[in-house]
Amino acid sequence: MPARRKYAVRDKWKLKKWYEVIAPPVFGNIVIGTTPADDPLKLIGRVMETTLYDITGDITQVHVRLYFQIIDVKENKAITRFKGHELSRDYIKSLIRRKSSKIQGIFNVVTKDGYHLRLTIIALTSYRCKTSQKRAIRKIMEEYVKERVPQLTLDELIHEMVFGKMSAVIAERARKIYPIRKVEVYKSKLLMIPTPEGPKPAVVISPLQLGR
């Protein structure tokens, strides 16, 4: 019986085909990995993780984790959409210092081309600050993202988040309130996508699951 199972598993793997996973145009449509499937429809909805370093080759960006979701398969290529990003926990821990303050803001935003996202931004001060100063810094975060994001397409927003432009502007403004050591867009998540019928949840489900 165990031998039969062994051969069954082996035969199942023989039926599988490998597909190249393609990053969205904002990341140059490069191949970010490969994934197997015995039916291309089973790939739809699968989430792939990589780092910004794997895309750019810049070792200083190894802490930026990127998530892409497969939305289509064409021949041997799995086409993806940006799902979100997150900075590694080890990197965030390395930024935290004793006798300093951490300010966090979570904001829901909508891009110029109709994509809804949730952004988590953190600011780390050089020294411990007062509650009123924390509130003022959080307000600067909110005012900036609410002012800036509606001017950007999704691709432009992704670029400003992961390459540090957004955090640099917030840090510059926040330093007028209190000495700031670091600002990071710690996390982003795609919530809604635009469709002809209006915004819809950014949920990707395989047609095979829909048919069950």
UniProtKB/Swiss-Prot annotation:
SMART domains: Ribosomal_S3Ae. PROSITE patterns: RIBOSOMAL_S3AE. Coiled coil: none annotated. Pfam families: Ribosomal_S3Ae (PF01015). The keyword Zinc does not apply. Keywords: Ribonucleoprotein, Ribosomal protein. One of its GO terms (cellular component) is ribonucleoprotein complex. GO terms for biological process: translation. The keyword Ribonucleoprotein applies. One of its GO terms (molecular function) is structural constituent of ribosome. Belongs to the eukaryotic ribosomal protein eS1 family. This is Small ribosomal subunit protein eS1. It comes from Staphylothermus marinus (strain ATCC 43588 / DSM 3639 / JCM 9404 / F1).
